[in-house]
């Protein structure tokens, strides 16, 4: 379950309870890692560019999946029954250490939403799949 990311080799796996060998993070952990590292890098670059006194950034992420009942008027099913909606929720908590004003802290949190991975996850995504021999 190794994968290449440029010159780097990563290991992804599932927990033993899911049939894996637990030799590495599962795919959702890798997704959260991408968002977390991108968030912290974006914040750090912004703070450096603006000369903010930011000593440390910590990003903690959690993923959960919920099912929301469909609205009564929403009826995409052929039999007229409304389909429930499965929603993936990513919870992100950012801890900023340093001598920042309340306004600077608020602006840094706004900048966090501008990291490229955040924009990809919240934007329109197309995934094109093809077979390769």
Give, region by region, the residue ranges found by the protein language model.
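Extended beta-strand/beta-hairpin segments
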Residues: 1-33, 41-133
């Amino acid at each position: 379950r190794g994968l290449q990311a440029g010159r780097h080799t990563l290991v992804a796996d599932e927990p033993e309870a899911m049939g894996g060998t637990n030799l590495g993070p599962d795919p959702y952990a890798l997704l959260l890692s991408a968002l977390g590292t991108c968030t912290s890098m974006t914040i750090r670059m912004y703070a450096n560019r603006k000369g903010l006194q930011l000593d440390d950034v910590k990003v903690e992420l959690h993923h959960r999946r919920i099912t929301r009942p469909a609205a009564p008027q929403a009826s995409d099913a052929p039999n007229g029954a409304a389909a429930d909606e499965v929603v993936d929720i990513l919870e992100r908590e950012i801890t900023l250490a340093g001598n920042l004003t309340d306004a600077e802290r608020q602006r840094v949190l706004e900048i966090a939403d501008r990291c490229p991975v955040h924009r990809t996850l919240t934007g329109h995504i197309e995934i094109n799949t093809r077979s390769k021999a």
